[in-house]
A protein has these predicted regions:
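Phosphate-binding and adjacent anionic-ligand microenvironments
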Residues: 1-82
Length: 82
């Protein structure tokens, strides 16, 4: 579990939509955030209702792979609202 700190007032829905479009070739679910299912791993992005953050949950075969997947999505999120 990781998180991305956001600037207050940022359009979180636009960020999540950007991520959703970027991974349109994968199985994407947009219930309670955005979940992207890859063949052997998944990542779930969920906005906080109490803080200006997006929580990033990832699962893969190893903790290192899950951490790397989480960092990849964090980099994408940061780039989309830079």
């Amino acid at each position: 579990k990781q998180r991305v700190e956001l600037t207050p007032g940022i359009d979180v829905d636009a960020i999540l939509n950007d991520v959703k479009q970027r991974f349109a070739g994968e199985q994407v679910t947009d219930i309670d955030g955005v979940k992207i299912d890859f063949a052997d791993r998944w990542v779930h992005l969920r906005r906080s209702n109490t803080e200006p953050i997006i929580r990033v949950y990832a699962e893969a075969h190893t903790q290192a792979e899950a951490d790397a997947l989480g960092r990849e999505l964090i980099d994408i999120i940061k780039a989309s609202h830079a």
